Structures are given as C-alpha cells and as structure tokens.
Design a protein with these regions (language model features):
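Terminal domain-initiation and capping elements
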Residues: 1-101
Length: 101
C-alpha cells in the first residue's frame, strides 16, 4: 500500500483592482488672469509653460478643460491645492474632480 503526501495548496493571492481614476477639471472664470492660471498649472500640476498655456486656453474657449487624471486622493489634493493657491491671491479660480468614464 502506498501513501502519498499532498502538500498545502498554493495560497490564492487576492486580486487588487486598480484605483478608480478621477479627472481634475479647470473651470473658466472671467476674473482670474491668464498668467496666474498658467502659474498655478505649472506649480501644482508640474506642466511646462506650453502645456499650461494650452490647458488655460482650452478652458477659456470651452468653459472647462481636463487638466490631468489621477487616483481619487491625488486628484482631490491637487484640486484643493490649486483652489487654495488662487484664493490666497484673491482669485475665484475653480478646479473640480469627477470620476473618469
């Protein structure tokens, strides 16, 4: 009679899902100077001057522009930092976040 020894089954690794992506959206306003918007985009979102200028113009012409896509926590943090930076200078610049489709 033979006896076979069976080792433990391999542990199943839990599947980790990618965090849901969130868009940071710049909303146009008629009060914040364009140069300041570019400065905020460069400082908070680490854009080049050309990239920031393009985003600013798109928001100006269309009313809004997606700035970047991040995980929820990072998107909300960056949007808050940008709004706070504008508020410190007395500008009503707004950034919002929403889930990416």
């Amino acid at each position: 009679m033979s006896t076979s020894i069976v080792g433990p089954l391999a542990e199943a690794k839990p599947r980790t899902e990618r965090p849901k992506a969130y868009k940071v959206i710049l909303l146009n306003d008629d009060y914040t100077p364009r140069e300041f918007v570019v400065a905020v985009l460069r400082a908070i979102f680490r854009m080049t001057t050309d990239q920031a200028h393009g985003v600013m113009l798109t928001a100006h012409l269309r009313g809004l522009c997606v700035v970047a896509v991040y995980s929820r926590e990072i998107a909300e943090t960056k949007a808050t930092q940008a709004v706070d930076m504008a508020a410190c200078e007395g500008y009503p610049l707004l950034f919002t976040t929403e889930p990416e489709d």
